[in-house]
Amino acid sequence: MEDELLNFNYTDSGLPVIIKVIGVGGGGGNAVKNMYHGKVRDVSFLLCNTDVQALDRSEVPDRLVLGREVTNGLGAGSRPEVARRAAEASEADIRKILDDGHTRMVFVTAGMGGGTGTGAAPVIGRIARELNILTVGIVTIPFVFEGKRKILQALEGVEEMRKNVDALLVVNNERLRIIYKDLKLDNAFAKADETLTNAANGIAEMIMKEGTINLDFADVHTTLKDGGIAIISTGYGEGPDRMEQAINEALTSPLLNNNDIFKARRVLFNIYQGTEDPLGTDELSAINELTAKIETGFDTIWGYTTDPELGKKVKITILASGFDLDTTRESIRIGDNLGNVINDPISSREIETQNERDNDLINRYYRPDELEKVKVVDFKPIILNLDELDNDELIMALEEKPAYSRTGVLLSRIDNIRMRIAESAGRLKKDVVRSEESERPAFESERSSSPTTISFN
């Protein structure tokens, strides 16, 4: 498989494509596949992965193997640090792909919580940003049932993404599970891909669709450049009060991750009307109310476009950035749902501090009521003693899967191995004691029969 990207495509109008969507890892690759076969137009696509087989299975033509010499093309094994090294090893290739003279905006999309997406996406974001390309991250974070360990790994990846992109949109899979309660598991992941697609498409069409009051790349650049945490939300309306319906739907979407649009530093919105029933002047009052609320010293840009596919409906897409991180946190702590104390050699204060940091990070993106509905397993570290460290069978069992994905069967096998090691070590120590006692002089054996004895049981 070729590791190089072909020349960028051109739009139907003959202009070079300035927007590139990069899918990183398995989750990002699935999202880009969905976009490639879906409605996202006038953009080009690139897949990046440490897993050669995953790339070979994709129909997206432009693909890059990350760090072949680091992973041998076999994937990162759910280890972000391996994926980070792989992406850094391919930095020259990534720069060559992006520094083509055309690309002015890059979407880096990934699922946070695994290996390649979590570790490599921030590296790709950094490279794009260093090339002065407007860089937007669009990532998912796990369902609660995937466990605390994966959630924390995902949110650490989110924090790294925040440092390395201009703006970051976070899609909470758990929020999707609550909104679409009757979805099967496969459909739930597909819904996450669809949400990523809609986010990228919403921004792309603001740039590419010509409007009566036109938005362009410069407007999106102004809104997202160094914007930090961002959101995009779309609402539809039909019939009486359709404009109010659309605005209300956009402003109250659960996918806003609890962010209040009116607390954003920058807001851009675009209004779309159909050709069958264009907006009347009397409907502008709802728009006036919206702009009155957000025009309080913040940068606000808006546009107005006709979309024949809407028929009699109207649509509004709101893009906002520059949220203070404090506004993304919940006022109620998670507490023992995720913060149980673990027994290990670390001091209790260090454990408490780490739990506080972990809970604070989780509180930025998950609501307490979401976490209460699904029991979250608190994965405790396995502290090995010297006998266990010398046991190859135990080490191989521990290396089969990361802690958050070990099933009851594997955990039982690990426990059984540790019990055998302990029993064997106990027998060995007893044999040593008996041997030493048999070699002692009689008077020393008598002296050892005093009540003060040492037990190896």
UniProtKB/Swiss-Prot annotation:
Name of the protein described by the UniProt record: Cell division protein FtsZ
The keyword GTP-binding is annotated on this UniProt entry: yes
Gene3D superfamilies reported in the protein's UniProt record: Tubulin/FtsZ, GTPase domain
One Gene Ontology cellular component annotation held by this UniProt entry: cytoplasm
Ranges of Polar residues composition bias in the record: 448-457
UniProt-listed CDD domains: FtsZ_type1
Entry keyword annotation includes Kinase: no
Keyword field: Cell cycle, Cell division, Cytoplasm, GTP-binding, Nucleotide-binding, Septation
Biased composition (Basic and acidic residues): 429-447
Task of the protein: Essential cell division protein that forms a contractile ring structure (Z ring) at the future cell division site. The regulation of the ring assembly controls the timing and the location of cell division. One of the functions of the FtsZ ring is to recruit other cell division proteins to the septum to produce a new cell wall between the dividing cells. Binds GTP and shows GTPase activity.
SUPFAM superfamilies, per the entry: Tubulin C-terminal domain-like, Tubulin nucleotide-binding domain-like
Assembly and oligomerization: Homodimer. Polymerizes to form a dynamic ring structure in a strictly GTP-dependent manner. Interacts directly with several other division proteins.
Family: Belongs to the FtsZ family.
Annotated positions binding GTP: 26-30, 115-117, 146, 150, 193
Transmembrane region(s): none
Protein's cellular compartments: Cytoplasm
Molecular-function GO terms, alphabetical: GTP binding; GTPase activity
Annotated stretches, region: Disordered: 429-457
